[in-house]
Amino acid sequence: MKIDTHQHYWRYQPQDFGWISDSMPVLQRDFAPADCLEPMHAAGITASIAVQARSMEQETDFLLQLASDNPSVLGVVGWTDLRSAQLQERLEHWTQNPALRGFRHIVQDEPDVPGLLSDAAFQRGVAHLQRKGLSYDVLLFGHQLPDAQAFCARRDQHWLVLDHVGKPALRNWGQADVASRWRKDLRALARLPHLMCKLSGLVTETAWSTAKAVSAGDHAAILQCYDEALEAFGPQRLMYGSDWPVCQLAALYGAVAETALQWASSRLSVSEQDAFWSANAVRAYGLTLPSST
């Protein structure tokens, strides 16, 4: 089985998705799991994990219902206010559904990233997730990675998952020190043995707004990032994610998956490919795979 560990689904309402601008018309519609099944299956990928795209409590309920209705969705990474005094009560409700596997907050857009990550209530919230056996997805821009070092080091009781290889600034990749700073900061985080890394979301870190497809130079930079992540994390702490449908701003699902398929087949052994495509996700998210018949 191959698992796509990073997909988003929504019923599009402009007021709920302020990050979807008018320059992104391809995203201004509904997206459901069934909409991605054909390109997934064409790439040999049969299952997904739904990741929050809205910072509101009903997002978790919405995604859990989708998981109940769609067997291909193996798990949900939801959203809740991790600083809330009602966190324990909410988790007791949601964890009755085995599809709930973790949570994410869009830290990258916070006005004070270091302040949030060091906030005592936020720290307690993530610690409570970990005691419940739930993962936490870390979403940051590349220049913010140093801000997460102490936070990730302290939250070591369960898996943390770094989304999008730490979002390297590929649109500025040719500028002095951009790649080297990201590489250094990624390696520092990778020293934490409880941190997984998703090879995901890189096509939209390129200059997609000025191109109809990922350029040869950007494609080479993406492969370089994959190689750097492999060297830093090793094959037992990497997972594939498409970031569909957001990836469609720059590339179709099939192109994103094909890049990962070709990279994995050329860099990883058979057993390491099994880890990359499935086993690592099972460990990080505590997934229960459907029994084969």
Task: Give the residues covered by each predicted segment.
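Mid-to-C-terminal alpha-helical segments outside catalytic/metal-binding sites
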Residues: 1-5, 26-47, 227-228, 233-239, ...
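Conserved, mostly hydrophobic/aromatic
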Residues: 6, 48, 63, 76, ...
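Divalent metal-dependent hydrolysis catalytic cores, especially in the metallo-beta-lactamase
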Residues: 21-29, 34-55, 73-81, 101-108, ...
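Alpha-helical scaffolding within the catalytic cores
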Residues: 32-36, 58-59, 86-89, 146, ...
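Active-site gating/metal-coordination segments in enzymes
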Residues: 58-143, 150-152, 166, 202, ...
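Short, electropositive alpha-helical surface patch
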Residues: 58-74, 155-162, 215-231, 253-265
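Catalytic pocket-lining loop regions of alpha/beta-barrel enzymes
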Residues: 116-239
